[in-house]
Design a protein with these regions (language model features):
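Conserved SAM/SAH-binding beta-strand->alpha-helix loop
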Residues: 94-95
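A short SAM/SAH-binding and catalytic strip from SAM-dependent methyltransferases
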Residues: 125-145
Length: 244
């Protein structure tokens, strides 16, 4: 297993390992630049097929061929796809998450950032799977633009990206429902997060929530065809991106 990760404490990975080893009440404290502290149970990363949101189940149904699961967490999607007979490579930047996936039986696991040159070692994939607001892995608008180009080196001919994201503009609504944010400032969907577990605080990281119109603009500018497969009443959506 090759790695390309920082030396910062792996709060997410440690929480998942704790759950995997029997501490079923393990929870992460998540701080962000847009909302107050949130509590994220480690159990959420271990959900079964029927505990997954409908949008995630739809994404699994739409997978085809060789799958690269990016930001795979504890491996719930990779394990489900394995059960269905898919060949899956699961990747996460968290060493603890990778260890959990190995313990749970994900057959092919690697510890990488999504931009690592060694991510696929030249292999091409039919499906790039990016769930749990997976577009966020790209971090920023610049990162999104960079990833859309990078993904072209990962996709086999006829391949697809299946990804979820959300429009978080509702966080900026005033009491009358009007949007209030600085049009000259950073894109409102760019968020900074920090995760805490036990006595560990992970390094701050950037995450992007791309509204559908923005995602479509960036993807089409990069040469992708865009198909929105599903949206829900919480402004989350599932999108398929393909190259001609």
């Amino acid at each position: 297993m090759s790695t390309s990760v920082s030396a910062a404490p792996d709060a997410l990975g440690q929480a998942l390992l704790a759950y995997q080893h029997g501490h079923l009440s393990a929870t992460l404290a998540v701080h962000s630049s847009v909302v107050d502290e949130e509590v994220l149970p480690a159990a959420y990363f271990f959900r079964s097929l029927w505990e997954m949101p409908e949008m995630e189940r739809t994404a699994l149904e739409e997978c085809r061929g060789r799958v690269l699961d990016l930001g795979a967490g504890a491996g719930c999607h990779a394990l489900e796809l394995q059960q269905r007979g898919f060949s899956v490579k699961a990747v996460d930047i968290s060493p603890g998450s990778v260890e959990v996936m190995q313990e749970r039986g994900v057959r092919e696991v690697a510890c990488h950032d999504i931009f690592d040159a060694a991510l696929t070692q030249g292999e091409k994939f039919d499906t790039l799977l990016m769930l749990m607001n997976g577009i966020g892995l790209t971090g920023t608008l610049a990162g999104l633009e960079r990833f859309l180009e990078h993904a072209k080196t990962l996709l086999a001919p006829g391949g697809q990206i299946l990804a979820t994201s959300s429009d978080i503009s509702y966080l900026y609504e005033d009491e009358e429902g009007a949007l209030v944010f600085d049009l000259n400032g950073p894109y409102y969907g760019e968020v900074e997060y920090t995760m805490h577990y036990a006595n560990q605080t992970g390094a701050a990281f950037h995450w992007i929530f791309a509204d559908p119109a923005l995602l479509q603009d960036y993807a089409e500018a990069a040469g992708y065809a865009v198909e929105f497969l599903e949206e829900d009443d919480q402004q989350q959506y599932l999108v398929r991106l393909t190259l001609p």
